[in-house]
Amino acid sequence: MTATSPRLKHEVKDLALAPLGRQRIEWAGREMPVLRQIRDRFAQEKPFAGLRLVACAHITTETAHLAIALKAGGADAVLIASNPLSTQDDVAASLVLDHEIPVFAQKGEDNATYNRHVQIALDHRPNIIIDDGSDVVATLVQERQHQIADLIGTTEETTTGIVRLRAMFKDGVLTFPAVNVNDADTKHFFDNRYGTGQSTLDGIIRATNILLAGKNVVVVGYGWCGKGTALRARGMGANVIVTEIDPIKAIEAVMDGFRVLPMAEAAPQGDIFITVTGNKHVVRGEHFDVMKDGAIVCNSGHFDLELDLKYLAANAKEIKEVRPFTEEYKLTNGKSVVVLGQGRLINLAAAEGHPSAVMDMSFANQALACEYLVKNKGKLAPGLHSIPVEVDQEIARLKLQAMGIYIDSLTPEQIEYINSWTSGT
């Protein structure tokens, strides 16, 4: 249902959900002291005054604090969902009603609605785009070349989105600066590892109420998200198997104490399969065919392409929902495969996404990346740019201070030593 308000355009499920969203946003804020400090500074300095901004992100309590910080900084912001199943409808309602931020997102929206919301966002003629998977940027490049002149730059938070941006740059169509937030140390070391690890298992447990102890859990991909997922699954008593295509990551998984197998060998052994690769069809027909009866598969990468769901649907006698966000595919071979969250991000489809404490740093990076683009307008070459090291370090310092933790600094003697080549044995 589209709600209407006399104050601003929006499409959310129900504005009556705003009180619950307000309460949950306030709770999340307790764990986000870094972003709060940035918001307070933005409110004084107004770095985005007069600028139009589009944020394509998962509409969660944590994202709400990013949007509020950007508005405090003077941004004329519009918010849309980066995934059809990740929107928290109460949060969307609160942002509209309590903060007067236009939101176009509803949990469970179909692909046509999702794509229409991308077009609505681009109708805002953004000067800055915060993207999560690069759908908005890709649409801009493919369909709205005339609007690129309005753009100062973009930021991207996901591995999947960075892969797309690199491909765009290689093809010569990334003609504006894009800040790679994903590779900031204060993002991927914590968000990708600790955030994904915890929230993925949270989503699986909420969807199934299954006991992980003693189960064979196959983690497909051993990047930072895979590392975190494997670590947490082992911590809950699972027997973890890792599959990889990168020999270096495979060695790392082995030395971290995990079994490493080709997917063809892991498929008949697994009870639960979790994909975290950002690539297409990493679990496909030949794997589904040999899985145990009742095997559970889910995705914690980005898009819903990691599992070949078209194959499953084509080879299913029956598909039925057995629990919320849990569908059983009864196959023609007599076995069944259980798919969680329609193959989309299980941590957001069935749970609430990453904990606020890690998103505090990720969204601090997003906020400061936007400020970096504004401060360097016209100075940055087209293509990908890293978060400045000093920004990364400052976010870490602020986080430590908020935790009541303080660290040492180099003495003058040590600084002199590490900058000299004359001292030796």
From Swiss-Prot:
Gene3D superfamilies to which the protein is assigned, alphabetical: Adenosylhomocysteinase-like, NAD(P)-binding Rossmann-like Domain
Cofactor note: Binds 1 NAD(+) per subunit.
Xref: HAMAP family: AdoHcyase
Name the UniProt record assigns to this protein: Adenosylhomocysteinase
Pathway(s) the chain acts in: Amino-acid biosynthesis; L-homocysteine biosynthesis; L-homocysteine from S-adenosyl-L-homocysteine: step 1/1
GO cellular component: cytosol
Keyword terms: Cytoplasm, Hydrolase, NAD, One-carbon metabolism
Keyword field contains Signal: no
Matching NCBIfam families: ahcY, PRK05476.2-3
The protein's required cofactors: NAD(+)
Gene: ahcY
Binding site for substrate: 60, 132, 157, 187, 191
Protein localization: Cytoplasm
Entry's EC annotation: 3.13.2.1
Taxonomic source organism: Nostoc sp. (strain PCC 7120 / SAG 25.82 / UTEX 2576)
InterPro entries documented for this protein: Adenosylhomocyst_ase-like_sf (IPR042172), Adenosylhomocysteinase-like (IPR000043), Ado_hCys_hydrolase_NAD-bd (IPR015878), NAD(P)-bd_dom_sf (IPR036291), S-Ado-L-homoCys_hydrolase_CS (IPR020082)
Family statement: Belongs to the adenosylhomocysteinase family.
Keyword Cell cycle: no
GO biological process: L-homocysteine biosynthetic process; one-carbon metabolic process; S-adenosylmethionine cycle
Any Pfam family the entry gives: AdoHcyase
GO molecular function, one term: adenosylhomocysteinase activity
Catalytic activity: S-adenosyl-L-homocysteine + H2O = L-homocysteine + adenosine
